[in-house]
Amino acid sequence: MSFSRRPKVTKSDIVDQISLNIRNNNLKLEKKYIRLVIDAFFEELKGNLCSNNVIEFRSFGTFEVRKRKGRLNARNPQTGEYVKVLDHHVAYFRPGKDLKERVWGIKG
């Protein structure tokens, strides 16, 4: 697989894949409920990050908020103008061991 033109997976694609997985296990759950669960999951993730909590999913990875230092000499790439960037917080994801190993094995 070439990394220059990768397929994009949307939330709707994930809902479809989960729905198929559930049906393959002889269970029934409508897609609208799967979408509600996914939306609630992301709201919880965002809420916890905004509360500065660390969110850990064993073997998958860890989400956290980190402080990024500001810079005096940042440049706006569109205008070329130099601007001051203040200290700010960013969401950060650190992959877990399982995920790292699986991604490491991707061919292409």
From Swiss-Prot:
GO molecular function terms attached to this record: DNA binding; structural constituent of chromatin
Keywords: DNA condensation, DNA-binding
One GO BP: chromosome condensation
A cellular component term, taken from the record's GO annotations: cytosol
Membrane-crossing segments per the record: none
Pfam families on file: Bac_DNA_binding
Domain of life (superkingdom): Bacteria
Record's keyword annotation contains Chloroplast: no
Family per similarity comment: Belongs to the bacterial histone-like protein family.
Function: Histone-like DNA-binding protein which is capable of wrapping DNA to stabilize it, and thus to prevent its denaturation under extreme environmental conditions.
Designated name of the protein: DNA-binding protein HBbu
Source species: Borreliella japonica (Borrelia japonica)
Gene: hbb
